[in-house]
């Protein structure tokens, strides 16, 4: 797997990849980012082919998203200043001293965290705020979405509740990036195995850990990647493969297509275009220079042999 060649490694943009995607895909790619504090980061230039929705209920963070959107230079996103929850209605948001730890679930007592993993009071509740929330099922109905190609969840413990609020629509989601915990940081928080089990019942398989946190070799949390095991719709399958390639999971994309009887040439066309786009110019220049040096050395070697032959013959 060429993991690590992701959207941030660019050199020449995604021009070839975009062109191939436009040829092969039924567009748009539908992405929903739940907990978009700091902005939507996954898409880069591929955002031009996407319909992106971003949820951020915390007022200060939502204002930052709006300002960034108005200033330009970032992908156009449909911003939603609301929360996603298992049920539509009013929910309490616990805003913590570290704003990014805010959650619909109440943090466990500070003594629990301090005694084990933290040296601050970052999980202390600074404010309680009543916010409007919508269920995933209601959201897709209101937005008239028949599918979600990529769902990202980072809501500090309420991810499984959000998924359960999607009901049978979960089967219409192709790829999920979901933050999970391995220890309870919030009251009543489901952990990794429960998330995996629930998603498996809707046809998903876990395929990768991404970034996460460890303390003294103990994993506390991680972003986890899930994908539907079987696709019956060719257009949906192709969008999933493109997403996998775009975020660096080349081998997953290859076997996804092969397992669904898609000619390997399709994968090669997509992967080659992506790799060509993200190979930095300096590497291309070095490769060209290295090739020229090899030719020069080869030529010099031939000349040396010729000189020795002529000398011995004379």
Residue map of PLM features:
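Phosphate/nucleotide-binding beta-alpha loop and adjacent structural elements of enzyme active sites
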Residues: 1-314
């Amino acid at each position: 797997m060429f993991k690590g060649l992701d959207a941030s490694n660019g050199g020449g943009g995604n021009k070839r990849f975009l062109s191939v995607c436009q040829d092969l895909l039924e567009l748009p790619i539908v992405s929903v980012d739940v907990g978009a504090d700091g902005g939507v980061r996954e898409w880069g230039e591929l955002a031009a082919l996407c319909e992106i929705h971003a949820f951020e209920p915390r007022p200060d963070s939502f204002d930052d998203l709006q300002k960034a959107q108005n200033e330009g230079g970032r992908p156009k996103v449909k911003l939603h200043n609301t929360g996603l929850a298992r049920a539509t209605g009013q929910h309490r948001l616990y805003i913590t001293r570290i704003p990014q730890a805010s959650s619909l679930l109440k943090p466990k007592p500070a003594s629990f965290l301090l005694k084990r993993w933290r040296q601050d009071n970052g999980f202390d509740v600074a404010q309680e705020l009543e916010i409007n929330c919508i269920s995933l099922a209601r959201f897709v109905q209101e937005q008239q979405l028949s599918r979600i190609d990529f769902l990202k969840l980072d809501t500090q413990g309420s991810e499984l509740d959000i998924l359960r609020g999607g009901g049978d629509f979960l089967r219409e989601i192709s790829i999920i990036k979901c933050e999970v915990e391995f220890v309870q940081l919030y009251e009543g928080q489901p952990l990794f195995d429960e998330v995996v089990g629930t998603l498996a019942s809707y046809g998903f398989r876990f395929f990768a850990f991404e970034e996460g946190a460890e303390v003294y070799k103990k994993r506390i949390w991680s972003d986890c990647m899930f994908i539907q095991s079987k696709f019956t719709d060719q257009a949906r399958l192709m969008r999933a493969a493109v997403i996998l390639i775009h975020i660096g999971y080349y081998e997953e994309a290859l076997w996804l297509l092969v397992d669904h009887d898609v000619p390997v040439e399709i994968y090669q066309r997509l992967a080659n275009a992506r790799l060509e786009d993200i190979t930095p110019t300096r590497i291309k220049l070095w490769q060209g220079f290295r090739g020229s040096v090899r030719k020069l050395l080869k030529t010099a070697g031939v000349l040396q042999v010729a000189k020795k032959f002529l000398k011995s013959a004379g």
